[in-house]
Amino acid sequence: MKALLDLFKQVQQEEVFDAIKIGLASPDKIRSWSFGEVKKPETINYRTFKPERDGLFCAKIFGPIKDYECLCGKYKRLKHRGVICEKCGVEVTLAKVRRERMGHIELASPVAHIWFLKSLPSRLGMVLDMTLRDIERVLYFEAYVVIEPGMTPLKARQIMTEEDYYNKVEEYGDEFRAEMGAEGVRELLRAINIDEQVETLRTELKNTGSEAKIKKYAKRLKVLEAFQRSGIKPEWMILEVLPVLPPELRPLVPLDGGRFATSDLNDLYRRVINRNNRLKRLLELKAPEIIVRNEKRMLQEAVDSLLDNGRRGKAMTGANKRPLKSLADMIKGKGGRFRQNLLGKRVDYSGRSVIVVGPTLKLHQCGLPKLMALELFKPFIFNKLEVMGVATTIKAAKKEVENQTPVVWDILEEVIREHPVMLNRAPTLHRLGIQAFEPVLIEGKAIQLHPLVCAAFNADFDGDQMAVHVPLSLEAQMEARTLMLASNNVLFPANGDPSIVPSQDIVLGLYYATREAINGKGEGLSFTGVSEVIRAYENKEVELASRVNVRITEMVRNEDTSEGAPEFVPKITLYATTVGRAILSEILPHGLPFSVLNKPLKKKEISRLINTAFRKCGLRATVVFADQLMQSGFRLATRAGISICVDDMLVPPQKETIVGDAAKKVKEYDRQYMSGLVTAQERYNNVVDIWSATSEAVGKAMMEQLSTEPVIDRDGNETRQESFNSIYMMADSGARGSAVQIRQLAGMRGLMAKPDGSIIETPITANFREGLNVLQYFISTHGARKGLADTALKTANSGYLTRRLVDVTQDLVVVEDDCGTSNGVAMKALVEGGEVVEALRDRILGRVAVADVVNPETQETLYESGTLLDETAVEEIERLGIDEVRVRTPLTCETRYGLCAACYGRDLGRGSLVNVGEAVGVIAAQSIGEPGTQLTMRTFHIGGAASRAAVASSVEAKSNGIVRFTATMRYVTNAKGEQIVISRSGEAMITDDFGRERERHKVPYGATLLQLDGATIKAGTQLATWDPLTRPIITEYGGTVKFENVEEGVTVAKQIDDVTGLSTLVVIDVKRRGSQASKSVRPQVKLLDANGEEVKIPGTEHAVQIGFQVGALITVKDGQQVQVGEVLARIPTEAQKTRDITGGLPRVAELFEARSPKDAGILAEVTGTTSFGKDTKGKQRLVITDLEGNQHEFLIAKEKQVLVHDAQVVNKGEMIVDGPADPHDILRLQGIEALSRYIVDEVQDVYRLQGVKINDKHIEVIVRQMLRRVQITDNGDTRFIPGEQVERSDMLDENDRMIAEGKRPASYDNVLLGITKASLSTDSFISAASFQETTRVLTEAAIMGKRDDLRGLKENVIVGRLIPAGTGLAFHKARKAKESSDRERFDQIAAEEAFDFGTPSAPAEEPQHPAAE
């Protein structure tokens, strides 16, 4: 009986734990795990197939091969369990212990663990303070290392060659000790006194001044402190005992034909054992030192290969010349333990099949093939059969199901009812890639899918397959029904738009039904109600598009909200509408007016319609409405009978003339080129321009002809109406196709690009209707093939970006309702070049206001701080013209180890405030990664047509208002009385009467201001003008010009204008100066006052010096009088090269990886006055003197464009050298808000170009994760080291503790990490190891004795617990609460007992129970 009870006991609950710690195992620890030493390299006996004793598969060490049976067969059956057979030494127990029992190998000579030696930076090297090269020479027996110098002048850890060693031995005898091999290294490690070393290092760190030393000491200190804290001894990095993996985890499987398939590990272990045994024998035989040494080296190499094959030297190979797969290879990479088995598991109760369309289904249903359902729900059916008494045993039930008796189908129906299943379509790029549906049993073998969910799954019916999963437990079913049911997921989490938008046929049907035609059959009739219209339509008295008058009953929300009053009341109105729209009004949900349907329904309109329905009528009504829209759309599209034929592609008659004119113009350019009037490049650019314009013109002519048709109205007059051409209707409604595609069918194909992206100058003038000739067809193949190649690359790159994003954000979960912060960001409409790119309402919708929103007219509070701004609120804000609202953002959230709901705002996929437990990090990553495949891969060359877009030369106001300048705007008044701008970052704003900003424009340096601060202007007024082709250098002081180093032929050259014959001086490049000229002088101007003294900068002793850049055209003469604001020189901007703009996916990756751009612009570190110092070779020295008089130097390459010149005042963070911005500089000089604005805007630019809508908050969430580490600048009394990077939450916790104890907290700087780096530097070593660089992460974690608190989602998935998000978060919270209350109760009981009994006396003799055998 007891045995049986024990059997049941074995299915014990897994232990509950809250953290996992990793460390180094000491030799004793390894021996304690082991069940015996593996002494022989043999595996199994080839005749008996029994494992050899003491071999790698030994049953005595690892356990029996069959359950409860020893090897020799003396003891069989359960009754002997636990007995150890005296004949073969095998314990009688379950065979599965062979999966968990380890063995060990006692190494005859210690061996260094390769991970701690070779994984960079070498940990052994750090601890010993020796170079990797030296340690390797010692370990692999090429050199000696001094261990005890004794009384000799040698130093400890000194490396000597063999020759050296023998000389020293002759010299000093045995005064000193030197060793080679791992023994020597082990001795050195043992000799280290960690506490003492840490003390000396800390003092050294305080006293040293050199950067390099500080870095070196800090690194070493970190490693040593880790050893000190974790209690791990450094000498454990040298192995004396090698653990042996349980045999079932490195199996040996017999194949047919008497051969064996074996795990590579067995080979590697065999080599180690062979070499170890040989070494033992050599040592016993007292073999010569050189032989022993060689054997020890070979043993070291064998162990290296076992642990990480190929890390050092050549990889060990098996019989077939491929490298053997070592222990390290088992866990790393895509096929390793982490990614293959722990993060990606296969699941039971699942099936897959092809999908077909199910237009008759409701939104929450899917059609499940009967046979599939039968297989998936088998256990449920077995249970039902037994309960009903149809079958007595499981076996009988199985037979019933196999025979598919009628009763089985009835039961299947019953089992399936109300039991949702989950459908998944790979690739699952966002959370809508898995949704739950209620199954409907169908015949056939294909799954039926509702058409409206296709958009979310990105599915089509051209052979796509989907997988079905069955949620088993009641909790799982509940979650599937409440959270994942398709009808509960109608919004995209990325942007809050509806995801159940009709497409293709449905759109076409609805569009066709809601179009209006002039003089349709029955036009002008009036009807009393919709039913009458339907009757007339069914009797062919009217057409769908005829204009008629109908009385329509709308259900409007009741004003009377008292008890018992109905929610909606009918309202009857006579509308002028069309037959189709009237018929559609039948399905309008309660609460929506008919006006939403009373227009042609194009795709965008339908999307807006569903969105309005969701906001006004709620989820249920919307789902029903969408379903009915779909049914109607399909029905109407079928009735419409729209088809395409060749005649629908109307080629415009004026095409030939347009193309002919273009060809003439091109000939003219060819002639000019031949005459040498234009360069080849200009000719090419112009030709391309002409053809693209021609293409546009033909397209326009074609669309004009296609989009309207002549028609006779009721009065017999001819008018034009929108065309009922099939192709036009498809494109116009948004069902299929676009203007560009129609242009290729009926206009001209236009210009094609070569594979390298350059445009071929001869266009394809034909279209598809006319047909292409051979050459045209050939040119077309370029694009088609490049498209396919790009798509393949794009998918991989996009997937990798998503993976990195998920990894960096996976632990970000909403953990509380409100963190109570008063920080936020000021949101304004996004304006580029005076155009509103994104309205304020879109940017603040669904966010929480952080300051009261005040009505600018009445100054009363509209919305208090802490209000979630919904549609009504943002519409009101927009109506009142409020242009700036401060809102909460994930970036400033003060919650530690998570986010709070208020800072995140609305959950876009649900339309309400985000719930605690929502995994917002993963959602953000999915929202950014999912559209990745739609982005382009290419970098754009700005050349030809694009770059010659008109260069702006003035700004004008777009609205009426008052001119205001930003604080950075500075200008001087010149002799003519004009205001000349002398600041680099000045901006002009237009504000309305309430002081609200309406628009803002950048005004460049050197511009002439036409309006001053405070001027009232009308729309269209010019604010400032400037010369677009040159950049001026302007003097801020008056005086007499005095040239310095302006020598013709040395620093400047004379240029004579061919046309005007005037001469100007041009500053020449240093490299082009004559040999005799000094390279360091730079041409500059000083100003003299009336007395001939140099003019000084006010308030300083510096003389005004204005330097000229290379390429500057000097416009003043020596000795000329100049006034304030006069132009001294001009720099032509023509010289700007056409830069490649990184676009698309690579740009997004570049931003999130926080890479510094190649030629980054330089920002001013401080506010102060600029001056130029002495130039070095190829660099110019720019000095900024701050207000205290301290000087900050920048060295700038000569070819860079310096945006400032002498004696100019710049503000901190202003750009002083032209180039793309470096995000790290922005963070350092302008702060978190500026950085976030930069990254959000730049990422959005890329997506906006592709027409992809993503909410800003997703990008902000990622930026928050990129900023999650800080760098300690002063450690105060904390445990950190200056210069160390630590997790922000950790540091804040530590600082709180310091303040509580009255000690000094640490101060820190923000650090921006790229997403890969941030993922790897996370506190969770499990998460980091499963991402990339597994070896390095694990090595580091083991030395530090890191503990993983299982905070993120990934760690929990890997260890197999519920993830701490959603219901899992609640589960863990409840569990922890219960544990702590249990502990309290336990303490209480213990206290009471002690109290009751005083001191417990000696325990009474326990009565002997009869044994329960």
From Swiss-Prot:
UniProt feature coiled coil, ranges: none
GO BP, sorted A to Z: DNA-templated transcription
Alphabetical UniProt keywords: DNA-directed RNA polymerase, Magnesium, Metal-binding, Nucleotidyltransferase, Transcription, Transferase, Zinc
A Pfam family matched in the record: RNA_pol_Rpb1_3
Region (Disordered): 1392-1413
Chain sites annotated for binding Zn(2+) 2: C819, C893, C900, C903
Superkingdom as given in the UniProt entry: Bacteria
Recorded catalytic activity of this chain's protein: RNA(n) + a ribonucleoside 5'-triphosphate = RNA(n+1) + diphosphate
Cofactor note: Binds 1 Mg(2+) ion per subunit. Binds 2 Zn(2+) ions per subunit.
SMART domains: RPOLA_N
Entry's EC annotation: 2.7.7.6
Positions annotated to bind Mg(2+): D460, D462, D464
SUPFAM superfamilies: beta and beta-prime subunits of DNA dependent RNA-polymerase
Subunit and interaction comment: The RNAP catalytic core consists of 2 alpha, 1 beta, 1 beta' and 1 omega subunit. When a sigma factor is associated with the core the holoenzyme is formed, which can initiate transcription.
Family: Belongs to the RNA polymerase beta' chain family.
HAMAP family: RNApol_bact_RpoC
Descriptive protein name: DNA-directed RNA polymerase subunit beta'
Source organism of this protein record: Burkholderia cenocepacia (strain ATCC BAA-245 / DSM 16553 / LMG 16656 / NCTC 13227 / J2315 / CF5610)
